[in-house]
Amino acid sequence: MKYTLAFACSQDGFIAKHSKDNPFEWTSEEDQNHFRTLISENEWQVMGRTTHELNPNHNRKRIVFSRQYKEIELIKKDIPDQFYFNPDLHQMSDFEKICSGNILILGGTSVHDFFIYAELVDTIHITIEPHTFNGGVRAFSYINFKDYKPYFLSKNYSYEEKTLNNNGSILISFNKNS
């Protein structure tokens, strides 16, 4: 099982202007193509409830983190591979009983925090888009944007950077070294 975390952010480090902001409205075509590739490479997606509600898709296998549910349960009875999961009440072994294969972690902040803190993430893809939000939703509650690179390098990740387009979109990838 491989865990990949992916998100886009503004050049000042925010993944959204506010909690209901949909990144598909401001991310580049190149980032959206990269995102579609990641979706095709990963069997399951993990996200918070707000992220799921912004972009529902009944055809994708999803685990939706939500503290509103005491039991692991189907989001909708007629969709067999989408579950609510409360990370405060259930163990990773419960999570891994549901999922098999590669997992794409999509956010938001508390979901990112959960997997980074648990040191489960193998690969991190961050697209930095040439927008400035001057505030909003952070990718991590305890890692500042300017500290991403030193933080992940200190956690034994390698670093790669790639220019995506002429507008200034940059893809940064961190890969966990064995």
Question: Which stretches of residues belong to each language-model region?
Answer:
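Enzymes that bind and transform nitrogen-containing heteroaromatic metabolites
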Residues: 1-178
